[in-house]
Amino acid sequence: MNQYDGKIKVSTLNSDMIRQINEIQRRNPNKKLYVEIPNTRGISSEMLRQLSPNISIRIEGAYDQERVSRLGDVKYDTGETGEYYTSAVIYTRNEAIRIISEMEKIEKGLEGQNFDQFEKVVYIYEKLKTGIMYDPKYEHKLSKDIRSLRGFITKQTVCAGYAVMFKEMMDRQGIECHYVSGVTNKGRRTCLEYCNN
C-alpha cells in the first residue's frame, strides 16, 4: 500500500468538514494524508474541488474494513493480496473529481424523471453497460485499475469493476446494494440490489 502518514475517517463530506481537513493538511504540509469515506452519497465534484489537491480520498464502497480483513489471505496471480483492497480504492483528489463528474453525468438523466427504485436500477445499469467497455485484457491489470471506480475514467473494466461502480451508483441513490464475491476457478463479481417495490 502507498505510504500514508495518516488517515482522517469521516462518515460524509460537507463544506465545513472540508475546511477542517484542509486546515489539518495546512498544519502538516509534509504529511501524506487521506480521507476515508464510506461512499460518495451527497458528495459532488464541485465540493471535492474545495479539498486540498494534496489530500487523497479512500472511498470504501464495496471494500469496507470487514471485507478487507476477510480477504487478507487471498493471493492473486498479479502477486497482490486481499489487503491490497485498502489501497486500490484510494484516489487522488483529481481522480475522485473525475469519477464523481462521470457519475453526475449519469445521474443527470434521472433529473425530472419520476423513476421508482427499480427504474433507477435499470437506467443506471444500462448507462454502465453501454458507456463502459468490458475488456478481458483488464483481468491481468492491478486491483487499483479493475477493482475500483477508475472504470468511470478509463471507460474499461471487468466484472469486479462493474460491480464496484454499480454499487457506488446505488449508494448515491440511497438504494441498498451489496457487493457479492466468491471463490471459484473463474470468479465473477456482481451486485445484489434491493428494491422496495
Label every model-predicted segment.
Residues T40-G42, T130-D135, E139, T157-C159, ...:
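Solvent-exposed loop/turn segments at secondary-structure junctions
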Residues S148-A160:
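Periplasmic OmpA-like peptidoglycan-binding domain that tethers envelope proteins to the cell wall
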Residues G161-N197:
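Hydrophobic/aromatic-rich core segments of domains that either
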Residues R93-G151:
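Secondary-structure boundary elements
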Residues M1-K108:
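Linear, non-domain "peripheral" regions
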